Amino acid sequence: MSSKTSIDLFKMARFTNLVIPVLTVVFFLGGYFLSFYLHFFTVFFLFLTIINFFYRHVQKTHALLRNFGIMGQARYMMESIGPELRQYFFASDTEERPFNREERSEVYRKAKGIDSASSFGSQKMFDATEIKIRHSMYPTAKDKLKPYSVTFGEERGIENKHMFTRPIAISAMSYGALGQNAVRSLARGAKAAGISMNTGEGGYPKYHLMEGCDLIFQLGTAKFGVRHEDGTLDDEKLRKVASEDAIKMIEIKLSQGAKPGKGGLLPKEKITDEISELRGVPKGADVISPTNHVECEDPTTTVQFIKRIQDVSQLPVGIKLCVGCLDEFRSLVVEMKALDIFPDYISVDGAEGGTGAAPKAFMDNYGMPLFPALHGVVTILKEEGVRDRLKVMAAGKLIGPGRQMVAYCLGADAIYSARGFMLTLGCIQALQCGNNTCPVGITTHDPDLQGGIVVADKAKRVENYVENMEHDFYQLLAATGKNSVQELSTSNLYIPSGTTLAEFIQPDAAFNKAG
């Protein structure tokens, strides 16, 4: 039945390919004999004829265009606007990835200072795939809650400790991945909100430093800004960076959630003269960082490298990693115990974390999701008796208060978010981060597109987002009946059997045990 009633597109294309040159001739004759103005149509159809001839007989790349001609181009045009059509007209509020419309809207509202209360009921799925937070029959009174604070470096007793006084920090985003207006907006907003910002692995943080916020300098595998020509660490360059008043901590990036086992990638389209100078890399080619630090060949050399950075910088030093194998992580912890050398914090990056550019094969298939990875890391630290020797941070799609509170229940001391703050700047999830064509000017170095970011306005939105996230944090904490995040545990979570976390938790521990 369908074969008889369906449209034969190939026949339509053949008919179209015949009609276009015929109409060209018809309008030419009409313009010659009837009215000169018909030659406007002659020019139009002659142009179509030439384009059609090129598609069908000259170009050899696209088989569809060789068979269907100009009519086949309609398919490519529809495909190119498909993401926009789905996002704005067809996808429901809870369908899109990595963040659906409901999740993005909550961030937008918090950034604009608009009440994010909803009506009628949740759009979440209350089934075996949703982790929920268990409330108490006896919520904690507001005046009984302990103000949030976490101090990095206190375990080692160093002089240059660093304290977070708000339950969120801006995760690693470099100048290069972001444009200068976006970096300055985030840094100015971080300063106003009193939170720290990670510089990312982009070398000397010129634009991060302009706004005076507390910074965490990230040392990537390429060591941009602090390297010798052979890619090894230049201690003097690192010492100079660490001496900047705004640099409060150093973070050694071992791996990243969106591309674990793969070095960072900055597409050549985004490498300006300035970025080339700041990173010490040539223009005209993609900048691909090594897969690992050349100094880190095994657990022993990795721990020794951590100690080296601590000695050179005289600052709190953490490591960032995406967990692949928990046994491998345990071997690293065992070596820390043996050498009595510990980082001041470990940042656990979930496989669902974001990036400006990464191979899709890595983005889709490698790394442990945040929650099981975080639980595994904290459990190993406890089993090895060293949980009190360092802090644990968590990152990976933590843009809303619910997932952040789950991370705290799983043992995190502090939370990182990157894409949450990008959304505060107006990110529309166009998925153009690596193409230098970001339509709102966040992840581009095109001066015209960057003009969309007004630093003063966006900095205020960053501040609003932090204020409203903190408000929700204390409300959710109070509902658990606890006084501080240090009292939270997995017993404060309902973890259904269908979640990736369930197999790592003891049976019934999250359901029957009193919170």
Predicted regions and their residues:
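Conserved, well-structured core domains of diverse proteins
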Residues: 2-168, 172-196, 202-212, 217-229, ...
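Internal alpha/beta core interface subdomains
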Residues: 180, 184, 193, 197, ...
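A glycine-rich phosphate-binding loop feature that marks nucleotide/adenosyl-phosphate handling sites
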Residues: 206-208, 322-328, 391-401, 482-498
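Glycine-rich tight-turn/loop motif centered on a GG-T
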Residues: 217, 221-225, 268-297, 356-371, ...
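Phosphate/diphosphate-binding loops
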Residues: 227-253, 369, 379, 390, ...
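Glycine-rich phosphate/ribose-binding loops and adjacent secondary-structure elements
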Residues: 288-450
